[in-house]
């Protein structure tokens, strides 16, 4: 298991809607990462998985490590390795990480968004179980309600799953489903979830973590930032 390429704040949109200062967005990003890697660690108590945090650029390991759950390994995913035609941008980072995991001898690999701090451990356990009990044609996707995906797992490093994808748009999950169908994969869907990349999703996060035990590191960061903050009611999902 791995988080997606780390090193930037969750989304450029968080600087604008609502307006966050760079240090606020960075603090949230670090808290998200800790909560997600803690979720991976909790899931590992039920299924035989290993947690990784993918990062870029090289040389940032020391800055990243304090924000990871104990036992989380690092894996470089800067997209610098050769990739087939059509695999560009963020897709190169994802493919780089997936290939590296298989090169380490794992029988399955996945990419997991670090912008999903409230993702239930049970969902990750289900995803790993589906992957580990499926055939070599098995793939698993967890779509976000904004059209992206928070999870993509596979039994082989299928570069085609990352080819010709319009990254950072609301068609990413749909295009990935199309690529899986073209490759003849057995694609299984996880429950719909959400990631934090705009005012509406941040407002949802603040409300969801208020008075709950979910995402403790994120909850602490929200409290330290003096939130809940007023969000724009017009930014409904």
Regions found by a protein language model. Name each.
Residues 175-237:
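Conserved alpha/beta core of the MobA/IspD/sugar-nucleotide pyrophosphorylase nucleotidyltransferase superfamily
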Residues 110-112:
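Short aromatic-hydrophobic micro-motifs that form the base-stacking/packing surface
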Residues 158-179:
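Short, glycine-/small-residue-rich phosphate/pyrophosphate-handling segment
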Residues 63-108:
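Short phosphate-binding loop-to-helix
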Residues 1-14:
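N-terminal nucleotide-binding beta1-loop-alpha1 segment
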Residues 27-47:
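A short, N-terminal amphipathic alpha-helix
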Residues 48-57:
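Short beta-strand/loop segment that forms part of the nucleotide-sugar
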């Amino acid at each position: 298991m791995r988080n997606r390429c780390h090193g930037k704040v969750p989304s450029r949109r968080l600087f604008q809607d609502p307006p966050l200062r760079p240090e606020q967005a960075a603090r949230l990003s670090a808290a998200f990462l800790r909560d997600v890697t803690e979720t991976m660690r909790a899931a590992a108590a039920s299924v035989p998985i290993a947690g990784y945090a993918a990062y870029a650029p090289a040389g940032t390991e020391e800055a990243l490590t304090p924000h990871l759950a104990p036992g989380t390994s690092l894996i470089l995913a800067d997209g610098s390795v050769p990739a087939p035609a059509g695999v560009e941008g963020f897709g190169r980072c994802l493919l780089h990480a997936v290939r590296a995991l298989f090169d380490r001898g794992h029988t399955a690999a996945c990419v997991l968004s670090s912008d999903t701090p409230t993702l239930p451990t049970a969902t990750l356990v289900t995803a790993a179980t589906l992957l580990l009990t499926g055939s070599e044609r098995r793939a698993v996707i967890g779509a976000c309600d904004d059209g992206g995906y928070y999870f993509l797992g596979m039994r082989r490093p299928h570069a085609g799953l990352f080819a010709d994808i319009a990254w950072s748009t609301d068609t990413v999950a749909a295009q990935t489903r199309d690529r899986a169908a073209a490759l003849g994969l057995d694609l299984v869907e996880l429950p719909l979830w959400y990631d934090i990349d705009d005012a509406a999703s941040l407002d949802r996060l603040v409300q969801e973590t208020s008075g709950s035990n979910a995402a403790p590191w994120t909850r602490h960061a929200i409290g330290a930032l003096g939130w809940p903050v007023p969000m724009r009611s017009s930014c409904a999902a």
